[in-house]
């Protein structure tokens, strides 16, 4: 029976992996041309920015609802429904662009609807991953990371090539990718329906997710770390792009910078299983955290665009190692009945805090030298590295708590054992086998 279950999990994980790859490549291909089409229709960069903002708004507004629904309803149906909704939204854009009649209202509405669908898919997908994850979860998570980085490399290149064939072609590919991904998810045999002991109100469920993340030390750490690293990385990328632009670097050189960063992430994800087989995870955490600080300090002295790109590639090579370790710990500590809500809380915090990163980078680049700006971000990474080092004992503890944590306040599942709920807030006693993958890893539009 164990062999049969492992074979089924391996098959379903492959379907999950391929569905995400097809979906992300299609979304990346259309995502790079969406602002170009909006700009061609309106002639306004502000309008193109508005469409992008509405896509983000759709995700953020829907995320809390989607997280609760992902812990109540069959997750496979939610994933398939979200993919088909996104396909319908992009089909409307496809027809309008092919007919030569797209309008700003239509593009903005489609972007918002796709953002809504994305939130639904992310929440349900994060809840489903534990059910299909093979026994060697770190290797599987590394493969997911590699898939995401590969899509970030291939998708924009494909989108640019398809755009040369016709403005509507990338949207056709995106629609097809959504439909194919929906079919692959539908073929998963594993029951993805969440465990549910008691039906409570929507607000009660939402508060339970927030409370669980805050009271579980490891989940609280991972949430803060992920938000901080995404903020710093987002600002660093904008810093490099803006600095290169002010120095007169050609667009091709800036594109090379981003490509090198993505390639570094891909290599890091592919090499993660080998690293984990030879080095203790906590050793990897300490080394990677402080090595990224050193690389950004060196970046403060870089003057050539290719040098920025090489250093970014090395930074992004290290970051998947940390991401896989932290995701694996979160998977061990999150109950099945809480996965959707926990993933939503962690992802939403990260996205909200990441939003001002481009603005901060722009202000710093305008007011300070490239050296000072890079050192500011190196200092921010040093704070994160120190925070990570201080939490090593908790990260390595079986129940995710450290010696300073009150066992009466946060038991093995991180819930308050003195509030008399006995798990009725949506938790259960099987927390040690549960888990999530953050939306940063699992996305409809990469």
Language model regions located:
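Juxtamembrane intracellular "pre-TM" segments in multi-pass secondary transporters
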Residues: 1-14, 190-224, 406-411, 442
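Structural signal for membrane-spanning alpha-helices in multi-pass inner-membrane proteins
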Residues: 35, 90-97, 159, 163, ...
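C-terminal transmembrane bundle of multi-pass solute transporters/carriers
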Residues: 61-65, 76-78, 85, 92, ...
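Helix-loop boundary and gating motifs at the non-cytosolic
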Residues: 2-60, 211-261
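Hydrophobic alpha-helical transmembrane segments
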Residues: 104-115, 139-193, 255, 259, ...
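Substrate-agnostic recognition of the 12-TM MFS/MFS-like secondary transporter fold
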Residues: 15-31, 55-70, 74-89, 106-161, ...
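Hydrophobic/aromatic positions within or immediately flanking transmembrane alpha-helices
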Residues: 17, 49-52, 79-80, 108, ...
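Helix-breaking motifs and short loop linkers at transmembrane-helix boundaries and internal kinks
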Residues: 42, 74, 96-101, 302-303
């Amino acid at each position: 029976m164990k062999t049969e279950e492992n074979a089924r999990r391996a098959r379903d994980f492959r379907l999950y992996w391929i569905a995400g790859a097809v979906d992300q490549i299609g979304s990346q291909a259309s995502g790079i041309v969406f602002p170009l089409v909006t700009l061609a229709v309106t002639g306004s960069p502000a309008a193109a920015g508005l469409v992008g903002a509405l896509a983000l708004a759709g995700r953020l507004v829907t995320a809390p609802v989607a997280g609760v629904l992902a812990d109540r309803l069959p997750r496979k149906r939610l994933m398939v429904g979200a993919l088909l909704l996104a396909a319908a939204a992009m089909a409307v854009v496809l027809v309008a662009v092919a007919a030569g009649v797209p309008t700003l209202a239509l593009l903005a509405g489609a972007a918002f609807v796709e953002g809504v669908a994305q939130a639904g898919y992310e929440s349900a997908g994060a809840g489903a991953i534990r059910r299909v994850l093979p026994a060697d979860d770190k290797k599987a998570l590394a493969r997911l990371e590699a898939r995401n980085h590969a899509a970030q490399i291939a998708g924009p290149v494909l989108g640019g090539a398809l755009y040369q064939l016709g403005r509507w072609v990338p949207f056709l590919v995106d629609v097809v990718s959504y439909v194919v991904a929906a079919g692959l998810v539908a073929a998963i045999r594993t029951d993805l329906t969440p465990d549910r002991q008691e039906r409570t109100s929507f607000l009660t469920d939402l508060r339970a997710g927030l409370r669980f993340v805050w009271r579980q030390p490891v989940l609280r750490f991972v949430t803060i770390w992920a938000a901080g690293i995404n903020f710093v990385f987002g600002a660093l990328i904008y810093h490099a792009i803006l600095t290169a632009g002010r120095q007169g670097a050609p667009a091709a050189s800036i594109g090379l910078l981003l490509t090198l960063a993505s390639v570094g992430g891909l290599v890091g994800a592919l090499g993660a299983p080998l690293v984990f087989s030879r080095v203790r995870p906590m050793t990897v955490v300490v080394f990677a955290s402080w090595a990224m600080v050193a690389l950004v300090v060196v970046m403060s002295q870089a003057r050539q665009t290719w040098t920025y790109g090489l250093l970014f590639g090395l930074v992004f090579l290290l970051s998947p190692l940390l991401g896989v370790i932290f995701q694996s710990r979160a998977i061990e500590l999150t109950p099945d009945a809480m996965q959707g809500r926990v993933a939503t809380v962690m992802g939403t915090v990260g996205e909200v805090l990441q939003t001002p990163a481009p603005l901060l980078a722009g202000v710093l680049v305008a007011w300070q030298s490239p050296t000072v700006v890079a050192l500011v971000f190196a200092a921010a990474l040093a704070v994160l590295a120190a925070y990570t080092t201080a939490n090593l004992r908790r990260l390595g503890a079986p129940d995710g708590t450290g010696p300073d944590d009150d066992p009466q306040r946060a038991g093995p599942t991180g819930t308050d054992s003195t509030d008399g709920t006995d798990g009725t807030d949506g938790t259960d006693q099987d927390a040690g086998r549960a888990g999530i993958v953050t939306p940063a890893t699992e996305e409809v539009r990469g």
